[in-house]
Amino acid sequence: FAQDRVAPGYLAREKAGRMDMALVREMGQLGLIAPELPEAFGGMGAGTLYAGAIVEEIARADFTFAYVPLLASLNGQILAAFARPEIARDWLTRLTAGEIMLAIALTEPKGGSDAANLGLRMERDGAHYILNGEKTSISANQIAAGTVVFARTGRPEDGARGVSAILVPMDLPGITTSKFDNMGQNQVGHGSIWFDNVRVPAENLLGDEGRGFAQVMQGFDFSRSLIGLQCLG
């Protein structure tokens, strides 16, 4: 699949700056997106080495297209572990089928990727959380159907203990995005996301408030090995 289907269109996709979602769906149909997830979420319960081999081989054909399995595995680990079962099932079965992509929004203009030093605010308002602030350098920010957002629910002095995570559908009112003019990796794209009084259902909270730092670290523990294999490919 990597050599026959992914490699031939690499330059055309990069020049167009557009992700080929039909090719992503092909990948999903072959079971090559987040196979380490449980079968209930569309995976096959495979091990880390299996998932890593997929990323390495896809990256050998097209480094940028390898973001498809990489981002799926990173977000999949977090959603499978912390989202409500019905929400995880809804999003992850579509993700593993290649119907959608997901992004992860941690990095901010002032604090970088310091997960304990976030400025984006998330406040409870009845059955919703209201998000205000900016994320930047987010991969797939304009093509993702949803984004796992890490935001501050506690006081700034709470540090890591005041960070929470929530799954945000990207079609909600109040969300705007921009795309960086990159030298490469144009298929997936990178850019900023602004949240202006974005109302997200409270049921989309991942786990408990104040547990976001531990959640993102758990996701990164898995994805770091995949990033290394992406570079190796």
State each model region's role.
Residues 119, 128, 132-178:
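A short core secondary-structure module
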Residues 1-69, 86-97:
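Amphipathic, small/basic residue-rich leader segments at the start of a protein or domain
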Residues 98-106:
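A short, Trp-centered hydrophobic/proline-enriched beta-strand micro-motif
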Residues 60, 165, 175-233:
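Glycine-rich beta->alpha junctions and the first turn(s) of the following alpha-helix
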Residues 63-86, 112-115:
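N-terminal glycine-rich flavin-associated loop
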Residues 46-47, 114-116, 140-145, 158-162, ...:
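Short glycine/proline-enriched turns and hinge-like loops at secondary-structure junctions
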Residues 2, 31, 38, 54, ...:
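Buried hydrophobic positions in well-ordered alpha/beta secondary-structure cores of metabolic enzymes
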Residues 60, 112, 136-142, 222-226:
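Glycine-rich phosphate/pyrophosphate-binding beta-alpha loops
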